[in-house]
């Protein structure tokens, strides 16, 4: 049962953070950021927030990370307004590499088809 609650809280935080980034954070560094997943610690004290950015430039990725870290206070404050939780978890933003990894595998498979 506790695991189900952790998953629900993670999904709610994912939805809310996407909404907050879209409507409340006016930082151009995070305009193209999309939250892909949220993993919660068992005691709900920490949320690892995975994100992607629509740019492949390393400088844009770094700027997005800095922008998210700067906006953490605003995001937590807005989460506190929108969620009915005793304590809002600490947020750790991590770039989601799974989409890039999947794209790389797709490209390798396409190259295999071309060679045959």
Swiss-Prot record:
It comes from the Bacteria. GO terms for molecular function: ribosomal small subunit binding. One of several proteins that assist in the late maturation steps of the functional core of the 30S ribosomal subunit. Associates with free 30S ribosomal subunits (but not with 30S subunits that are part of 70S ribosomes or polysomes). Required for efficient processing of 16S rRNA. May interact with the 5'-terminal helix region of 16S rRNA. Keywords: Cytoplasm, Ribosome biogenesis. PROSITE patterns: RBFA. Monomer. Binds 30S ribosomal subunits, but not 50S ribosomal subunits or 70S ribosomes. InterPro entries: KH_dom-like_a/b (IPR015946), RbfA (IPR000238), RbfA_dom_sf (IPR023799), Ribosome-bd_factorA_CS (IPR020053). GO terms for biological process: maturation of SSU-rRNA. GO terms for cellular component: cytosol. The keyword Ribosomal protein does not apply. Its main location: cytoplasm. Belongs to the RbfA family. It comes from Streptococcus agalactiae. This is Ribosome-binding factor A. It is found in: Cytoplasm. NCBIfam families: rbfA.
């Amino acid at each position: 049962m506790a695991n189900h609650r952790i998953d629900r809280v993670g999904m709610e935080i994912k939805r809310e953070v996407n909404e907050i980034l879209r409507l409340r954070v006016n930082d151009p560094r995070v305009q193209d950021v999309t939250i892909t997943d949220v993993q919660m610690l068992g005691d709900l004290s920490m949320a690892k927030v995975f994100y992607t950015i629509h740019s492949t430039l390393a400088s844009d990725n770094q700027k997005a990370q800095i922008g998210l870290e700067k906006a953490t206070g605003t995001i937590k404050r807005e989460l506190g307004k929108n969620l009915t939780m005793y304590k809002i978890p600490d947020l750790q933003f991590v770039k989601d590499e799974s989409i890039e990894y999947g794209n790389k595998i797709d490209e390798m498979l396409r190259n295999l088809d071309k060679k045959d």
